[in-house]
Amino acid sequence: MWFFARDPVRDFPFELSPEPPEGGPPGPWILHRGRKKATGSAVSIFVYDVKPGAEEQTQVAKAAFKRLKTLRHPNILAYIDGLETEKCLHIVTEAVTPLGTYLKARAEAGGLKEQELSWGLHQIVKALSFLVNDCNLIHNNVCMAAVFVDRAGEWKLGGLDYMYSAQGNGGGPPSKGIPELEQYDPPELADSSSRAVREKWSADMWRLGCLIWEVFNGSLPRAAALRNPGKIPKSLVTHYCELVGANPKVRPNPARFLQNCRAPGGFMSNRFVETNLFLEEIQIKEPAEKQKFFQELSKSLDSFPEDFCRHKVLPQLLTAFEFGNAGAVVLTPLFKVGKSLRAEEYQEKIIPVVVKMFSSTDRAMRIRLLQQMEQFIQYLDEPTVNTQIFPHVTHGFLDTNPAIREQTVKSMLLLAPKLNEANLNVELMKHFARLQAKDDQGPIRCNTTVCLGKIGSYLSASTRHRVLTSAFSRATKDPFAPSRVAGVLGFAATHNLYSMDDCAHKILPVLCGLTVDPEKSVRDQAFKTIRSFLSKLESVSEDPTQLAEVEKDVHAASSPGTGGAAASWAGWAVTGVSSLTSKLIRAHPTPVPSDTTVPQRPVPEGNPAPAPALAQAIPATSGHWETQEDKDTAEDSATADRWDDEDWGSLEQEAESVLAQQDDWSAKGQGSRAGQINHPDHKSLESHWSSWEVEGSWDQGWQEPSSVEPPPEGTRLASEYNWGGAEPSDKGDPFAALSVRPSAQPRPDPDSWGEDNWEGLEAESRQVKAELARKKREERRREMEAKRAEKKTTKGPMKLGARKLD
């Protein structure tokens, strides 16, 4: 009945593209573009329409359908699906382009490189070797029209219409009846009386010679043209002549031909072919071989075709990371290939892998990700950054390796615009406060200050008011000179985020104190910044109506537009200090010696001041730092590929243990100021200035003279005067926080950046401290005496044996 009849073409899971057909090999087939209905993936569809009176061609088409369906080889056109009806034949294969069309398109774009042609011919010869040596089949149709190219640039052998068995099963070679194909037949086939001895591969190797001639010289006009090699490379001419020789006996086996061309200096002996051969066998390679291969791959990617990198190298890189435990070595080639991808492809293929990499505990992989974040940050959306990446990145702030801490700080420049309110204004500020106050590496403290200045415009108004002034003020007390410069430039970079009252009462007093800094670079930047703030104050003083315009950004929401200004002010610090940090880390991971981190106050006139050791590494002005940026960047890039050679260890150490260790630092070294100066031991010195409890200890190292002389009797310290008049405390004393030590008030939260953490607390007299210390010593002495008395009166056996008799 009619309603049981169904159209098999309509139910076929593939459909033809409305675009006109691409043509195809001379013969019955017409090549169409197509797609799979379910997924939309691209395919190629070979269509043959059955016509009355063409039974011979129909049998040829059906034989080709059967051969292609049963033959599986990487260099033979891949069969996907097929449809056979009384009216038509459909063969669905991977998406391919005829070689002639491909070469013409590439010629318009500059032509194929010799290495691409060598690999393409290598694939065709390898397919012939498979057919002749493994399957005992004669292709009988090797020509330009029988070769196709997939999207990765891989050459595939098709055109199996006239294939027959080399053993004679099923009769001789089928008749072609197409003049365009018969011109590729070897001369011995044209002479029916010829009794020359030939091998089973002789005819196909002749046709291979014709293919080589056409690849380099264009369409073959006649067989006599084969005598002139034309544009065939010299390294291939000798082997080509063997293929088109009149004696079929001397034509080499396909395997032998490959071996000859792969010899040193041969046409198929190059880096591109070597890379492809390794990728084909990568699943059976040893881990050490894979590591070496991926390390060297990046150098070659620039010379490889873009389609090859996208469609062949990239899948292998993703597979190597997903299942092969390749580690950090895949990152550099992965991101290099990613540059050629469209945004949609990048999101689909690389971003899921990157997100997974951030959860790795491999230090080398983590630092590579941080170093190369600029290449993929634009493809990350905000939810992914806040929920899947930022929580893992913050572990780097607590890492024991200085290089990871530094790269984590730098990465915040890229992540900050995508962070939400909680992560940016709360979580990140906690880590920055801890690094700036406690980190034992001066360059890391410096870069923390620089980073804060660059991302200041992204902070909320309340966070800016609470954090920026206090953080930059603390940086100006750092014994590391570049940190003090960074603090000054931080004020300058964020000048539009402060009210006029803050400029006059909080910022200018701090900057004025730096005009007598021992380092000229600090003094120079301080004077420049002071003039900038004074000009603003003066303009508002002359015209008070400008106040609203000047302070428009103070209470505004985050304003990313000012980030560029911040970057230009402080762009020198990240690069310049990065190279210094790298040198320190490569030399030894221990902290910098105290005599280089704590500059001394200049000696009086008349005595030549010794040049500090750090002066060689610290430039005199910020302009010089900018000139060093290119050289430092080159040095960092030169050393970037050496991270795998170092023993990074694991990140499995709990963050709590690191925090506990840092809290222990703050409990050490509560000695006197004189002790800080007279003892050059670096560890004890660091414990003083890195403590959260000691507010002013960063500036004590260089504000004190090199030799401490007792003041005349009766002399009072400046901070002991009541500058405010009637008030007994130092509430009105703006200088008290610079010279006195905090009182024994409740300790502030070390993870907070509130005002109480940064402003000076009420001073405690030295007599009270001495009295407390004396009481503790007396109490300890009494405890020890009581224990000794108790031991003397104890009778009976002791813990480790019987009591000796008198």
UniProtKB/Swiss-Prot annotation:
Function: Regulates COPI-mediated retrograde protein traffic at the interface between the Golgi apparatus and the endoplasmic reticulum. Involved in the maintenance of the Golgi apparatus morphology.
Signal peptide extent: none
GO biological process, one term: retrograde vesicle-mediated transport, Golgi to endoplasmic reticulum
Keyword check for rRNA-binding: no
Superkingdom field: Eukaryota
Molecular function in Gene Ontology: ATP binding; protein kinase activity
Chain positions covered by the region annotation Disordered: 586-642, 663-806
Keywords carried by this UniProt record: Coiled coil, Cytoplasm, Cytoskeleton, ER-Golgi transport, Golgi apparatus, Phosphoprotein, Repeat, Transport
Domain Protein kinase residues, every copy: 14-314
Compositional bias ranges of the Basic and acidic residues kind: 763-773, 780-793
Protein family: Belongs to the protein kinase superfamily.
Subunit annotation: Homooligomer. Interacts with GORAB. Interacts with COPA, COPB1 and COPB2. Interacts with AP2B1.
Disease: Defects in Scyl1 are the cause of the muscle deficient phenotype (mdf). Mice exhibit progressive neuromuscular atrophy, hindlimb paralysis, gait ataxia, abnormal hindlimb posture and tremor. Pathology of mdf comprises cerebellar atrophy, Purkinje cell loss and optic nerve atrophy.
InterPro entries to which the protein is assigned, alphabetical: ARM-like, ARM-type_fold, CIK-Related_Protein, Kinase-like_dom_sf, Prot_kinase_dom
Domain-related comment: The protein kinase domain is predicted to be catalytically inactive.
Biased composition (Pro residues): 601-611
Subcellular location: Cytoplasm, Cytoskeleton, Microtubule organizing center, Centrosome; Cytoplasm; Endoplasmic reticulum-Golgi intermediate compartment; Golgi apparatus, cis-Golgi network
Recorded coiled-coil stretches: 755-795
Single GO cellular component term: centrosome
Protein name as it appears in the record: N-terminal kinase-like protein
Free-text tissue specificity from the UniProt record: Expressed in diaphragm, quadriceps, thymus, liver, lung, spleen, kidney, heart and brain. Prominently expressed in neurons, and enriched at central nervous system synapses and neuromuscular junctions.
HEAT repeat residue intervals: 350-388, 389-427, 507-545
Protein encoded by which gene: Scyl1
Comp. bias intervals (Acidic residues): 752-762
Region (Interaction with COPB1): 791-806
Phosphoserine found at: S752
